[in-house]
């Protein structure tokens, strides 16, 4: 179909997510023709280094030949089947293999088709568990400040970011949102080195006041992605696990963004050495190939639903594409590659390498407040004044202008406000990391000077 203006056709029909469409008048979407490895290629042949893994999900590179082969084989055998009253080998094998890798005690798997769906399932599962174990008074959820768990109504209700939720407040559940937990701008005047997890006192106060009416506490473990790749101490999670046990509150671990090796552990909660009652995962699970998610829980939770039909205790929650065999086959291949190629070891080694390179390139820049990292994830917080940590006026859209310049240079560096970040495929080469750092430096200096 040569001669078609795809940009114009896109503008005519497509409403893109998470952006103001009017921006397209000056910065239209790039039409991608194909991708390979860490690179996207547009219809004009220009290459873009995908340093954000296409919204954090491309785990092992685009068009990975081994994953492609697994998908092609599976689609010829079984593309999909209803997952109630039926099952299939890829789903069974995936659950069996993951059960040996998960935090202790997580044994029962439910299948869904995106991160928000996994969170919705976790919330409903936790609520029904409390109800069926004699606690109908428990109707509320607790969550961390500036948390993000998806954009469906239930997920928004346990999120704390006004950017996504403010306009919908009349529709949302009345939940409990903790305060504090901003380690860059610590309200207690602490640094990461002197932190004593003082901010946990707000969580303690919330449990004392609301603990007996709370169903569950949901967390992004260690890393709060949409809040700007905020990284908080593992001790906070250890304290939270203890409080949940004390008050009979379930702990829901949202690993959708941080799981599958992003932080240097297969699951981020491993940094704290504790296990949740329910774990959600997606994104890297299928390496960005297929929409699929899992909500995984313990025998204890599962047993509260296991009863005769007439008791109506079943977990009546379903998605059409639950347990899709193609997604399961891909996920199995992802696990195989990660184990065989020692991906987690590479993540930790290359994470240190990338941090050194970014510090050399931008660590002393006049507008860099902090370069924080965990695993391969790095966030560069850009501020007007690093000494006072004063943020730029949001109307200046510093991060957005850097994004535009980076795209001109061939680097996908989509920001969160004035925070730019690296979250690349886990098998990225050091050569491509070097290229990403150089292009990032050029883009920052083009907008903010040296």
Region roles according to the model:
Residues 1-450:
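Conserved N-terminal phosphate-binding loop of PLP-dependent enzymes in the Aspartate aminotransferase
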């Amino acid at each position: 179909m040569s001669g078609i203006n795809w940009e114009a056709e896109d503008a005519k029909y497509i409403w893109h997510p998470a952006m103001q469409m009017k921006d397209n008048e000056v910065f239209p979407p790039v039409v991608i023709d194909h991708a390979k490895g860490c690179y996207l290629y547009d219809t004009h042949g220009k290459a873009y280094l995908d340093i954000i893994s296409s919204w954090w999900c491309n785990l092992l590179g685009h068009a990975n030949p081994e994953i492609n082969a697994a998908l092609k084989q599976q689609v010829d055998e079984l593309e999909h089947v209803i997952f109630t009253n039926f099952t299939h080998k890829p789903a069974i094998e995936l659950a069996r293999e993951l059960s040996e890798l998960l935090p202790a005690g997580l044994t029962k798997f439910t299948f869904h088709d995106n991160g928000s769906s996994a969170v919705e399932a976790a919330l409903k599962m936790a609520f029904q568990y409390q109800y069926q174990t004699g606690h109908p008074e428990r109707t509320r959820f607790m969550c961390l400040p500036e948390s993000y768990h998806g954009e469906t109504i239930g997920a928004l209700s346990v999120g704390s970011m006004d950017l996504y939720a403010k306009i919908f407040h009349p529709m949302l559940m009345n939940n409990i949102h903790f305060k504090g937990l901003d380690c860059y701008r610590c309200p207690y005047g602490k640094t990461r080195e002197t932190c004593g997890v003082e901010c946990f006192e707000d969580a303690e106060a919330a449990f004392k006041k609301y603990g007996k009416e709370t169903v569950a506490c949901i967390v992004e473990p260690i890393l709060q992605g949409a809040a700007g790749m905020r990284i908080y101490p593992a001790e906070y999670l250890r304290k939270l696990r203890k409080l949940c046990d004390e008050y009979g509150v379930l702990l829901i671990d949202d690993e959708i963004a941080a799981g599958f090796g992003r932080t240097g552990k297969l699951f981020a909660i491993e940094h704290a050495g504790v296990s949740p009652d329910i774990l959600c995962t997606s994104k890297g699970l299928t390496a960005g190939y297929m929409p699929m998610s899992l909500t995984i829980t313990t025998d204890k939770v599962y047993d509260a639903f296991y009863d005769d039909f007439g008791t109506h205790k079943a977990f009546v929650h379903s998605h059409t594409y639950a347990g899709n065999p193609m997604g399961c086959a891909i996920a199995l291949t992802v696990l195989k590659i990660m184990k065989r190629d020692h991906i987690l070891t590479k993540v930790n080694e290359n994470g240190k390498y990338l941090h050194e390179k970014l510090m050399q390139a931008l660590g002393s820049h006049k507008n860099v407040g902090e370069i924080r990292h965990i695993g391969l994830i790095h966030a560069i917080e850009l501020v007007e004044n690093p000494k006072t940590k004063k943020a730029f006026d949001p109307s200046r859209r510093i991060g957005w202008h850097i994004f535009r310049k980076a795209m001109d240079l061939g680097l996908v560096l989509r920001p969160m406000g004035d925070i730019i970040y690296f979250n690349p495929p886990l098998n990225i080469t050091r050569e491509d990391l070097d290229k990403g750092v150089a292009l990032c430096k050029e883009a920052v200096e083009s907008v903010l000077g040296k």
